[in-house]
Every structure is written in C-alpha cells, then in structure tokens.
Amino acid sequence: MKIYDISQEVFGCQVYAGDPMPEKELLSSMENGDLYNLTAFRMCAHNGTHVDAPLHFIQGGKAVDSIDLDAFIGMAYVAEHHGIVSADDAAAILEKVKKQNPEAAKRILIKGDAEVSSESAKVFAASNMFLLGNESQTVGPPNAPMEVHRILLGAGVVLLEGIRLAEVSQGVYFLNAAPLNLSGADGSPCRAVLITAER
C-alpha cells in the first residue's frame, strides 16, 4: 500500500487573494518554563487544502457537517489536464473513468493548471458525481469563480481545492478527504490523501 499526501502544509499554504492568512500563537511553552506546550490558531475555512460545502455559494445549501462522508471518502480518479476544461474535455474524462472504474467517476481530481469552465461544470454537475478536486485555490476562473461554484455546488457536488498532485500519476485511487466536523461551516480544511495498493 502507498499513501500520497496531497495536502498543503497549513501555515505555509497558498491563500486565495483577499482571504486571511493562517496564524498560530504559542499560548504555553515548555521552553519558557511552562508545564506543557499549547498552540492556538486562526484560519479561514478555505485556506490551503480544503473542501467547499454548498453553503459557500448557495443560500440555504448544506453546511460541511451535513454532507455524507462518502462524498469525501471512496474510489477516485486523477485526470491530468492543463488549461481550460471544455464540456467535451469533461465528457471525455467521465467516459474514460466510467470504463475503468464506475465508482471512481464519483470523485474526480484534476491534476495540472486546469480551469473548469461553466460549460464543463454543467457536464460534471449532470453526471451525479460527489466531488470534484483541483490544484488551484478555486475551481473556476480565478477572476470570476462564482458561476462555476454555483453550478457545481448547486448540484450537490462538493469541491476539494488546493490539492497537490505533482507526485501522483493519472489513475484510480482511494481518496480520504474528510473535512473537520464544523457545525454550520461553509467549508473546512482537510488532510487529503490518496491510497493505492501498489508499493
């Protein structure tokens, strides 16, 4: 079994423009004579590697603690793509995955500097998939991500953003990207990993 950590380190992570940076504060320090070390931290729900719940862009949408965990845990497919993902590209990815492993078609991770278009978002949304992941801090065009988010989240497709797939080849894996159990939250950081039977 081989485990790929596809998460960013939180305090050195990439942050979407305008979002606050993660911060940590040492409240107690054994080095300073305290009995124990104790750290407090503050961060945005969408810092680093994180999931977007429908509530992020859909008024009345599901919060992160209301989403079934099987959306984040199960067979997944890593597809490499660079540039804009067209509707035809999305359809081709889905067709290829369904032939290899129909269960993996429910969770697709896009490797590369891909930008999901509104047209491809509609194709993914219509496929009844659970999760779409990408390496960028936002799944849509960086200067106008709202429409793509609304299409996908409105269809109940959760988003896994800010993953790191440089060490991962295309193919089928087991994904665990469970979010923290944050009541009423529109998103959550997660420690996303891919697992394969190969060593």
Predicted regions and their residues:
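Active-/binding-site microenvironments in catalytic and ligand-binding cores
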Residues: 1-199
